[in-house]
Amino acid sequence: MSINVYEMVTNRIIEQLENNIVPWEKPWQGTIDGAFNRVSKKPCSILNQMLLKYDGEYASFKQWKDLGGHIRKGEHSEIIVFWKMYPIKENQDDGTEIIKTIPLLKYINVFHISQVDGVEPLKQKVTHDIEPIDKAEKILNDYWNRENITIEHVKGDKAFYSPMFDKIQLPLFEQFKSSEEYYSTATHESIHSTMKVTRCNRQEDRKGKVVSFGSEEYSKEELVAEIGSAQLMNIVGIETTKSFRNSTAYIQSWLKVLRNDNKFIVSASSKAEKAVNYILGNQ
């Protein structure tokens, strides 16, 4: 029986949401590394960060063995996913044959450093060269100025991005309970702003579809914005704050989307990662 990797991933996210755990809102641990591969030192993708239980070092059974470690008896693995390119033959109209490559989602089992004997953990980077709030302010201001996005602060309770006017409206800074809450909201709306055709072009996905609160398309874009915002907050070192966007109503709307489309969490995390890189200027 073949294993549906999309189903495995989606079921893991659904399980967390059903237990009121929002997987992209990891508790702040004082390190911006998140989960990463012990051998390559590369951070895990946004999707894999959501799938894994812990921050810190992960590696496959073989990688830990090559490092001189061994997995303790009774320990259970977790999964991470990756794309693998496969060649396929395709016949052309003129009878010729070409080789194309298609991406397939695969998974491997990994273990956390806490499950391993014989390998010392690496030292974690805990300090920040720049204050998190200052870093968040610089990243957003650089992005807004680079893209000529209009920013309006209006006394009230509405925060939104207007694609028509390429404008982000936010409540006044002093209306927020904390600086962290302000920047959480500002990054959320900034992720929305990357939907523009000349940026990450998620507007193309919405053509001819109903986009209103509670609709599937609305929930999909909200999921992209939430995942992307949480990732940006983690990058600058600000604890992701609980918000109305993680209320029961929102969680239920996300569950509905994920149950209807077992490929969407993979797509949403990929779109969020693309949006984050665009804002950071890494595209």
Set out the residue ranges of the language-model regions:
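N-terminal accessory/interface modules of nucleic-acid-binding and processing proteins
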Residues: M1-Q283
